[in-house]
């Protein structure tokens, strides 16, 4: 009489109990602090939600970068007393003319010192500067990656929405937010660059002249919005005294009149700069600007040393919270344009889930009937192992908080058929041994041992394909790959460990004369 391996019994019990605990939140609400309470995340196609395709405005970023480069070049040319004229940015290139071709050598040294990745084109005394292809691609990748991270933080500031963000092509970003019931809110927070800057107000400028286009050199006209006076214009200095890059905290609050405000704090460097600004400009107005729109322009009453401040304006509670969120996560490197928008209703997702349930149930019942008709009692053991495999799949999806999509359901249904493949291989090998006239115990042991290598090889090749789909696929393809991978691992465990254990228990304690396979 054979002895049952204790490690298999213990392992099977532990895995099954753990799987039940992990899968339970999908059926009932768990409030215990000691038990898992996360259920499976449903993808956009099952849960409904918003699907946005964003275009990264790289041309604007490149133009701003070239403008900064042009300013740096002007300072260096003046410093080295090199004469030039008509220095301007056009079509993402810097164009200028030098007064004498003899200064070209010195000019090239200055440009290479500023940025060695700049390509210099020379036509007599006319110079054209542009980024090299490698620098252009590096900047593009940097801007897209930064945009993806900022979008992720804006959309999922609490870490509970599970958005899907994928780069598509050179400068497109696909954003999917399952369960989003307010796509207009998403469009609002993504449509703002959230570039916060501090400027001094140009008190000497004439507003009426500025509106007509006569803006003093070094200043600019911007628009504000007052609760009491409506829209109005103000002239501010172009020079940025301080930017939102130094902010560490931002939160919505209320002032003494119960009006919504945004409170903020700077880091050490920002606090020092802010203190110097307020100390040196007491009595002047400090304009707080967001995306070239005036938020407020309070009078500086004295030095502010602590690095804390407030932004007042025509805020509602919602807009104050929204601005605080945008300031906390930081500004986008460049504007984003929404070029495609789709909303998937929850009813469509519910229909997909119901169809998936029906297909899965039909497939499961058909497989179970086939196994019992073909293999009798041990076919029933394969069905029990199949049920446990489905339990393990459900538990692992819940444990890893994987997102289940419609293709993922297809992967699970496919796993139902694949799960019994291993059992079929084993049972057919057992049949071959029984035809040789050997004992039941020997046939079972030999059948499992001889089929083991084949089962491992076939499943490993499928896993390789699943990994490739996950690495190179996007969206729904990844969901299919995840479900397929988890399904393969679960079915291998149930077929090799669970089925063998059930058959061993049956043979040891019930001592059947025949296995019903002949």
UniProtKB/Swiss-Prot annotation:
Q: In terms of domain of life, where is this protein from? A: Bacteria
The record's annotation in Gene3D superfamilies points to: 3.30.1360.200, 3.30.70.3400, Multidrug efflux transporter AcrB transmembrane domain (1.20.1640.10)
Chain segments annotated as transmembrane: 9-29, 356-376, 377-397, 406-426, 463-483, 486-506
Q: Where in the cell is it found?
A: Cell inner membrane
Its cellular-component GO annotations read:
plasma membrane
Named from the GO MF annotations, one term is: protein-transporting ATPase activity
Question: Which Pfam families does the annotation name?
Answer: SecD_1st, SecD_SecF_C, SecDF_P1_head
Record-linked InterPro entries: SecD (IPR005791), SecD/SecF_arch_bac (IPR022813), SecD_1st (IPR048631), SecD_SecF_C (IPR048634), SecD_SecF_C_bact (IPR055344), SecDF_P1_head (IPR054384)
Q: Name one GO biological process term.
A: protein targeting
The protein's topology relative to the membrane is:
Multi-pass membrane protein
Keywords of the record, alphabetical order, are: Cell inner membrane, Cell membrane, Membrane, Protein transport, Translocation, Transmembrane, Transmembrane helix, Transport
- Family, per the entry? Belongs to the SecD/SecF family. SecD subfamily.
Alphabetized HAMAP family for the sequence: SecD_B (MF_01463_B)
Assembly and partners?
A: Forms a complex with SecF. Part of the essential Sec protein translocation apparatus which comprises SecA, SecYEG and auxiliary proteins SecDF-YajC and YidC.
Check the record and name the PANTHER family matching this protein: PROTEIN TRANSLOCASE SUBUNIT SECD (PTHR30081:SF1), PROTEIN-EXPORT MEMBRANE PROTEIN SEC (PTHR30081)
Record function comment: Part of the Sec protein translocase complex. Interacts with the SecYEG preprotein conducting channel. SecDF uses the proton motive force (PMF) to complete protein translocation after the ATP-dependent function of SecA.
Q: What NCBIfam families does the record tag this protein with?
A: 2A0604s01, secD
Q: What is this protein called?
A: Protein translocase subunit SecD
The protein's organism comes out as: Rickettsia prowazekii (strain Madrid E)
Q: What is the lineage of its organism?
A: Bacteria, Pseudomonadati, Pseudomonadota, Alphaproteobacteria, Rickettsiales
Quote the gene name from the UniProt entry: secD
